[in-house]
Regions:
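RNA-contacting regions in translation and RNA-metabolism proteins
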Residues: 1-214
Length: 214
């Protein structure tokens, strides 16, 4: 809610002619507002030494901002966060402290970018296919972090990177692989060559031979 004479930053999205003159259309939900606030609070962004490469936003709830710098000695994430988080907190304060903002490092390598976009989840493994789908394998202890509340974290990461992201539990995948390998090993053991003929022999055939010997 807004109060009379309350100061609030807005983004002017459109100026148009109305029946009573010019109408100014403003927004507080746009990505451009977020860019403007970082330019205001972070000198490196204002000067262009830190570049905002992408934003995924669900206004009033959470945003992910990917930043990059090609200048040596500049930490783009640290510059935007500020000492003790003072810079990013100033941006969050503009939204009444209600919108969480994740600042991440931008990478031109999709696998690295996707893995970083899913933070705070760590130790994720990313595999890509030709249809811009990312299969991400996450340790069980980080699964809820990767997905986020009501799927928000993975949804924002998908918007930010442009990939459809499918999350799978790493341990569950390993267990399934182990089951398949065990089954294959069992099949091989059941069809080992006979010592005499060199032909595959099943367990049942082996038992018959043992009975004949007796």
């Amino acid at each position: 809610k807004y109060r009379l004479n309350q100061m609030r930053a807005v983004y002017i999205s459109e100026i148009r002619e109305g029946p009573k003159g010019q109408e100014i259309i403003v927004s507080r939900a746009s990505k451009e507002l977020l860019i403007g606030l970082f330019k205001r609070e972070v000198p490196e962004v204002a000067k262009g030494s830190v570049i905002i490469k992408g934003i995924a936003r669900e206004a009033g709830f959470r945003s992910k901002v990917a930043v990059y710098s090609n200048q040596k000695g500049i930490d783009p994430v640290g510059s935007c966060v500020g000492q003790k988080g003072v810079r990013v907190q100033a941006v969050i304060g503009e939204f009444g402290g209600l919108e969480k903002i994740d600042i991440i490092q931008w990478f031109d390598v999709p696998k690295d970018y996707i893995a970083t976009a899913l933070s705070p989840a760590k130790n994720v493994r990313v595999e890509l296919d030709e249809k811009k789908v990312a299969h991400v394998f996450v340790p069980g202890e980080d699964l809820s972090l990767a997905i986020g509340k009501e799927g928000q974290n993975v949804r924002l990461a998908s918007k930010l990177t442009g990939y459809r992201i499918e999350i799978e539990e790493e341990n569950a995948v390993k267990t399934e692989i182990e089951k398949v390998e065990a089954k294959e090993a069992q099949t091989v053991s059941e069809t080992k060559p006979s010592d005499q003929t060199g032909q595959p022999v099943s367990k049942r055939q082996g038992k018959k031979k043992e009975e004949k010997k007796k």
